């Protein structure tokens, strides 16, 4: 009986931790380093669908959805940031254009694959 209860609790903990790590919401901003390098060592390309996130592994693909208009785009994490309170992701101008915004916007994030 205790084994079943323990297994059920472990399964619930795994499901809860996975679901909470899979989604995030907050403010997205647009950034471009002007040809510099990202934290992953890549050259910044404002025409690519890439982004900066504080903790997701480099190479993670994230669906970003603009909460204002419902548009979404899949970006690849290749940099670190944003380092401004309340912001959850920095997007290249190409990704921001695909989402239909400039400046700041409220977004939902969902990990597509790591």
Predicted regions and their residues:
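Secreted/periplasmic proteins
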Residues: 2-114
């Amino acid at each position: 009986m205790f084994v079943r209860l323990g297994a059920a609790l472990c399964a619930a903990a795994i499901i809860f931790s996975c679901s909470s790590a899979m989604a995030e919401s907050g403010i997205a901003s647009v950034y471009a380093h002007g040809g510099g390098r990202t934290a992953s060592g890549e050259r910044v390309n404002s025409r690519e669908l890439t982004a900066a996130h504080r903790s997701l592994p480099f190479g993670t693909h994230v669906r970003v959805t603009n909460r204002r208009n419902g548009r979404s785009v899949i970006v690849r994490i290749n940099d670190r940031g944003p380092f401004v309170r309340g912001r959850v992701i920095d997007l290249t101008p190409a990704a921001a254009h695909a989402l239909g915004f400039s400046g700041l916007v409220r977004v939902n994030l969902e990990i597509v694959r790591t």
